[in-house]
Amino acid sequence: MQEAAAEKALVLCSGGADSSTLLAMAVEKYGPENVFALSISYGQKHSREIQSAAAVAEHYGVEQRFLDLAAIFAESDCSLLEHSEREVPCESYAEQLEEAGGAPVSTYVPFRNGLFLSSAASMALSLGCSVMFYGAHHDEWAGNAYPDCSPEFVQAMASAIEQGTGGQLRMEAPFVAWNKAQIVKRGLELGVPYELTWSCYEGGERPCGVCGTCRDRIAAFDANGVVDPLMR
């Protein structure tokens, strides 16, 4: 009897702590030869996270693909985008939400994750994958900070992808009920090379340590009793 082909997986990998942990989990389950990492440029103010995504993919020995979708966001004034004159906020998600009165935070790129997931689904299917992974987590959607990270959004996109591919592809988002500290805990267990990752909204040699994403990342490592390797 002919042996069944191994299942292949695609992981959306930004180069940050969350998606790098997700990549490690996929590699553990499917083996590096059966995992693809997809990294997407969207016109962000620096390329540091894409460089980190490449380093993490190389570390795990997985094939990597890149997409550039910057043109789609050319009309957006999101503070993360290179053409925007808005300052990237230094407040935590919770503080930003309080200021925004429950509206999405200023670093919300309009429907970015919907576009990312649709693009990833097309690429995953073309690469012969039967599963794709998305690293949205609780801290991102709590209080409507990023509505395209919410459980409702994840469920809707998972259904659309399954229906739109005729059941050939499924989407999994295992972190949607986890906070960042829980993700880091799992990553530490797996030996994720967090020193290769990048989360900061700035693109310097070292993280700024004060922007919202730096503060949340530092707190996640602190909650696990360790120092973020990028802050040593």
Question: Predicted regions span which residues?
Answer:
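ATP-dependent adenylation/nucleotidyltransferase module used to activate substrates
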Residues: Q2-G191
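Residue-level recognition of conserved structural "scaffold" positions that shape functional pockets
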Residues: L22-L23, D216, R232
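A polyampholytic, Gly/Pro-enriched intrinsically disordered region
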Residues: V88-P89, V192, I218-A223
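Local cysteine-cluster metal-coordination motifs and their immediate loop/turn environment
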Residues: S118, W198-A219
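Short amphipathic alpha-helical interaction/hinge segments
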Residues: T165, D222-G225
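Short, intrinsically disordered, charge-biased short linear motifs at domain edges
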Residues: G187-E189, Y194-G203
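Short cysteine/histidine-rich metal-coordination sites, predominantly Zn2+-binding motifs
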Residues: G203-G204, N224-R232
